[in-house]
């Protein structure tokens, strides 16, 4: 059986010099599944599972990065995730990897306990959330992205029909660059309040009647939906820039209706 010589020093190959002199903008680990807890708007802690991407800039003269340090960072980051905690993780990663620039991104399911509009029955609804941060040239930028399922009802269908109108489930995706802490629930509310109607996980018959009539009284094209959400984001000082998308999974077509608005308030006229 081979035994390692106590005097033997294992070579650190990735720290050797690379003679090709080509920098790598982003190198790290991708699609790492790891449990985490998230601090909710009410202050509660919600357990979930995140899919993490972590990477750093690699100088031209360095052969490789230290891949194990990315996972070690996740293992040691057990505190509930907040925007400020995420910022601290990003700074810690740069120190650990001795890097001048880097990025962390995590996507996870986030659950909100919702109360049905008439019966009051409670149920959970899931949302896809992504928190991302990047640091470069001493500047750190943080991004919060939420995918919110809603209901949309077609104004044209309502106008031309003697009764009824076609409606469908839609996705509103808000990818916001943050100037200050912004709860996930705040972005969810903006999307839901500007849709024809929001969704619930569990509805009784009186609730279903409410949802049907609410959507009928509040018809919106996909263009209306993105413009109304954009107005809300424009008025929120916690958001400095955003990419906003809406996709209607049309119930009378085998394709979707789609709209996008992108705006950086720092460069707005």
From Swiss-Prot:
UniProt keyword Metal-binding present: no
GO biological process: tetrahydrofolate biosynthetic process
Disulfide bond sites: none
Pfam families reported in the protein's UniProt record: GCHY-1
Organism (species): Burkholderia ambifaria (strain MC40-6)
EC nos: 3.5.4.16
Function comment: Converts GTP to 7,8-dihydroneopterin triphosphate.
Alphabetized UniProt keyword annotations: Hydrolase
HAMAP family: GTP_cyclohydrol_B (MF_01527_B)
UniProt family annotation: Belongs to the GTP cyclohydrolase IV family.
GO MF terms, alphabetically ordered: GTP cyclohydrolase I activity
Full protein name: GTP cyclohydrolase FolE2
Top-level lineage group: Bacteria
Pathway: Cofactor biosynthesis; 7,8-dihydroneopterin triphosphate biosynthesis; 7,8-dihydroneopterin triphosphate from GTP: step 1/1
Recorded catalytic activity of this chain's protein: GTP + H2O = 7,8-dihydroneopterin 3'-triphosphate + formate + H(+)
Site (May be catalytically important): 154
